[in-house]
């Protein structure tokens, strides 16, 4: 079923998504309020609940992200999710929904949405089609000069850092699920400032999330904004070069000496390789390769 628990999609986005899924062999339903304008938080919640309760629906495909899916998650009972487990597909603001799915113990798919069929490079399109058909990803990504090598495994969680920050301390905070669980953290964003990145890593440290992270996959930091007047790096040992430099040095100064892969093709660019959240993933980082597999 097509839903949009975040921002209101256009009719074109809904049509493109429906047609694309149909060409892949799926029967597509459209939730009643997906194009309702204006609509309310309750309308978005009703679409989500309707999809969960509909026994003919096997997956909830989010048409777009945007803002405020957390409002819907605030209304959603984790017990309801557990009672009606369904696949969830989306990314960006849908990270709040992924967090709730994880707390409920249900895997979900971090993937592009309507952009799959009009704004994504073909290898990513094909990878998404394979994952929806049941093939688990096995990727080799290019190395980055600031990568920290190592081989680790853990349950993959995360997504958009700004949205994930908003989930901290909520009933859908992914760190609430199974205190003994170890994670691989996925982290990407668009339009993020250096201060935002510092805030995310600091809060993830304070709530104890980073202490349970075995490794980090940083996706693209699209349109990243340096803040030289506030966070120049002069108080952290010298000027920061970019977002990757900020993250690497903050993790080091906080005592997290774990494998980290930077600038993986996941996020808001033309490349957004899909991933399966809530499942054990293996991360093998060497000087020449980043191998991510299940």
Task: List PLM regions with ranges.
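Conserved beta-alpha junction segments in alpha/beta enzyme cores
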Residues: 8-13, 20, 155-187
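A short helix->loop->beta-strand "cap" motif at the edges of active sites that frequently abuts
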Residues: 56, 81-87, 106, 213-214, ...
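Internal helical hairpin/lid segments
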Residues: 179-243
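Short Gly/Thr/Asp-enriched flexible loops that form oxyanion-binding sites at enzyme active sites
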Residues: 66-83, 99, 230-231
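Conserved anion/nucleotide-ligand pocket segment
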Residues: 107-172
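Short, acidic/small-residue loops that bind anionic groups at enzyme active sites
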Residues: 78-100, 107-114
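ATP/nucleoside-binding phosphotransfer catalytic cores, i.e., glycine-rich phosphate-binding loops
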Residues: 218-294
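ATP/NTP phosphate-donor binding region
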Residues: 1-56
């Amino acid at each position: 079923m097509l839903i949009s628990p975040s921002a209101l999609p256009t009719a074109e986005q809904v049509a493109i998504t429906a047609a694309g899924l149909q060409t892949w062999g799926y029967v597509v339903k459209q939730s009643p309020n997906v194009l309702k304008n204006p609509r309310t938080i309750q309308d978005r919640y009703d679409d989500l609940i309707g999809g969960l309760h509909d026994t003919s629906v096997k997956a909830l495909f989010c048409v777009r992200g945007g803002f405020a899916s957390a409002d819907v998650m605030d209304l959603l009972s984790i017990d309801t999710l557990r009672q009606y487990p369904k696949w969830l597909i989306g990314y960006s603001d849908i990270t709040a929904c992924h967090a709730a799915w994880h707390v409920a113990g249900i895997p979900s798919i971090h993937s592009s949405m309507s952009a799959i069929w009009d704004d994504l490079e073909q290898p990513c399109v094909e990878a998404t089609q394979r994952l929806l058909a049941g093939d688990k990803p096995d990727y080799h990504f290019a190395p980055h000069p600031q990568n920290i090598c190592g081989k680790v495994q853990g349950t993959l969680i995360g997504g958009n850092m700004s949205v994930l920050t908003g989930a901290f301390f909520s009933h859908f905070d992914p760190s609430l699920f199974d205190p003994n669980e170890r994670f691989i953290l996925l982290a990407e964003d668009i339009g993020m400032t250096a201060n935002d990145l510092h805030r995310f890593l600091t809060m993830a440290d304070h709530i104890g999330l980073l202490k349970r992270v075995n490794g980090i996959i940083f996706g693209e930091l699209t349109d990243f904004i340096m803040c030289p007047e506030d966070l120049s790096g002069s108080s952290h040992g010298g000027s920061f070069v970019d977002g990757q430099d900020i993250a690497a040095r903050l993790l080091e100064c906080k005592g997290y000496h774990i494998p980290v892969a930077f600038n993986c093709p996941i996020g808001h660019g033309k490349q957004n390789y899909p991933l399966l959240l809530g499942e054990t993933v293996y991360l093998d980082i060497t000087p020449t390769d980043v191998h991510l597999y299940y």
